[in-house]
A protein has these predicted regions:
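Short beta-strand->loop
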Residues: 100-111, 132, 246-258, 267-270
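Ligand-binding "clamshell"
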Residues: 94-101, 121, 126-130, 210, ...
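Short, low-complexity disordered leader/linker segments with a strong preference
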Residues: 1-33, 354
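Early extracytoplasmic/lumenal segment of secretory-pathway proteins
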Residues: 26-92, 221
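Ligand-binding pocket segment of bilobal, Venus flytrap-like solute-binding proteins
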Residues: 169-173, 177, 181, 189-253
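Conserved C-terminal helix/tail region of periplasmic/extracytoplasmic solute-binding proteins
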Residues: 324-354
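Mature extracytoplasmic/periplasmic domains
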Residues: 267-327
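Hinge/lid segment of periplasmic solute-binding proteins
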Residues: 70-71, 87, 91-137, 150-157
């Protein structure tokens, strides 16, 4: 889901953790802050800036999926100060009492610089915006090669077009693949109606002979290299691949899609709460948010940072900063409970086994 360029953050990245971004493993003069974030989802230079300006050492750990992150936070064996979960996982963490309410007086940049529309979107999973500050956001849409696709796609059903057989890329992701199939049929991406889920399952099974591959990060290289005609992609990745291959374009299908938001939260057992607040406030500073946007290319909800973008095309990019009011049926993924997760897992196994 996140930016993939294989840069090493602050040196050697191990399979478990990054034990600090400075030259020494010792805590800074004002202590430390332990951050757990998606891989390649922050400009390393901003971590150095934070350390230099505050005297707080950043201890940095990375995860690949929300489902890998959650049990580590839940177990409490690794006490993190700041974590960056996605929308539905924020809701799950709230319901299971794993994160604490934020004091916006301690993070004034979050209050002043994050656009109201993003807080409104986030309220679907964080009522009252009590627990989470939006960090990045985006959509899921169709990426396509204009030299290989005759007519620009407008519907999710275009991913079932037989003329693109073996040239279609789908996401190796339960939530995202089912979102596509559910939206194709006019259903909610958060549906727990088994008749609707069965229809979506049947569609995904019927599509399988047409699909070249179920991918995550590989979709970028394949689309850049012209190895596929059409596929599913996150908007932030679309910005990157279009920059690498101008034959590519991105569209949100008319049936609607998922609008996702990742944000900063503070776990209940955070050992350095004050430093966590300073870190979140720093990341919401316009110049810092701009650096992170330019590094990871995912849309920033920081409206003050957007005003600092010098490239007018990027500043007004309909992909990076979509006008969501022009689309119908946009939804944020919600946490559907353990029974809901088991239901989606059951139907996904049916798709994969047929």
């Amino acid at each position: 889901m996140k930016k993939f360029i294989a840069l090493l953050l602050c040196g050697i990245l191990t399979a478990t953790a990054l034990t600090g971004c400075g030259s020494s493993s010792a805590a800074g003069e004002n202590g430390e802050v332990i951050v757990y974030n998606w891989g390649e989802y922050i400009d390393p230079e901003t971590l150095t800036m934070f350390e230099e300006e505050t005297g707080i050492k950043v201890v940095y750990d990375e995860f690949e999926t929300n489902e890998i992150m959650y049990p580590k936070v839940e177990a409490g064996s690794s006490a993190y100060d700041v974590v960056c979960p996605s929308d539905y996982m924020v809701q799950k963490m709230i319901e299971n009492d794993l994160i604490q309410e934020l004091d916006y007086d301690k993070i004034p940049n979050a209050k002043e610089n994050i656009g109201a529309q993003y807080y409104e979107q986030a309220a679907a999973y964080d009522p009252g915006n009590k627990y989470c500050v939006p960090y990045c956001w985006g959509t899921v849409g169709i990426i396509y090669n204009k030299t290989m696709v005759d007519t620009p796609p407008t519907k999710w059903a275009d991913l079932w077009d037989e003329k693109y057989a073996d040239n279609i890329l789908m996401m190796d992701s339960i939530k995202d693949s089912f979102m596509v199939a559910l939206k194709k049929n006019g259903f909610s991406s958060n549906s727990l109606d088994e008749s609707e889920l069965q229809i979506a399952t049947n569609d995904l099974i019927a599509q399988k002979p047409l699909v070249q591959a179920y991918v995550v990060d590989q979709v970028r290289d394949k689309m850049i290299g012209g190895e596929a005609a059409i596929g599913v992609m996150f908007s932030g990745d679309a910005i990157y691949v279009i920059g690498e291959n101008p034959d590519l374009d991105y569209v949100i299908p008319e049936e609607g899609t998922n609008v996702w938001i990742d944000g900063w939260v503070i776990p209940k057992n955070a050992p350095n709460k004050e430093n966590a607040e300073k870190f979140i406030d720093f990341m919401c500073r316009p110049d810092v948010a701009l650096k992170n946007f330019e590094y990871i290319t995912y849309g920033t909800p920081n409206t003050a940072a957007r005003e600092l973008i010098e490239d007018e095309d990027l500043k007004n990019s309909p992909i990076a900063f979509q006008d969501l009011t022009q689309y119908n049926n946009l939804e944020t993924f919600l946490y559907l409970g353990e029974d809901g997760e088991e239901l989606f897992n059951k139907y996904w196994k049916e798709v994969m086994s047929n």
